[in-house]
């Protein structure tokens, strides 16, 4: 068994937006979309950091993250401030590789930028870890 980690974005288009009519699927208007923004496998250090610093204890693995939180997490990843995961050496080392660090930082910062984009929609970003 392993840890699968998802960063998703939900985008809701208000019905009153005449300039931005809702798309249709099977002739029904689409009021929201779920976007796959990021995925990690067995990145225990990142998971433990998010759970320790951003989970209110009641979310059962789901944590809503705002732009400030996403940037704080990206900074912690970039600066090597995640706690040691002590999961398995080769997996923990993989997530510390420069290209993996850069990809994680980019994913988190892109999600923060997406939240702040003013496009007359309502948006949320959620982290979810499943094991």
Where are these regions (language model features)?
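Acidic (Asp/Glu-rich) sequence patches and key acidic residues
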Residues: 1-124, 128-131
């Amino acid at each position: 068994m392993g840890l699968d980690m998802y960063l998703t974005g939900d985008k809701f288009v208000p019905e009153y937006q005449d300039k931005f009519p809702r798309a249709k699927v099977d002739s029904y208007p689409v009021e929201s979309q779920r976007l796959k923004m990021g995925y990690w496998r067995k990145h225990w250090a990142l998971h433990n950091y998010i759970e320790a610093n951003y989970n209110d204890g009641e979310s059962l693995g789901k944590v809503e993250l705002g732009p400030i939180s996403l940037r704080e997490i990206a900074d912690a990843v970039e600066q090597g401030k995640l706690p040691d995961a002590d999961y398995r050496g080769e997996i923990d080392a993989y997530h510390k590789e420069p290209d993996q660090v850069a990809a994680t930082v980019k994913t988190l910062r892109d999600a923060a930028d997406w939240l702040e984009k003013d496009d007359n929609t309502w948006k949320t970003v959620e982290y979810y870890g499943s094991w």
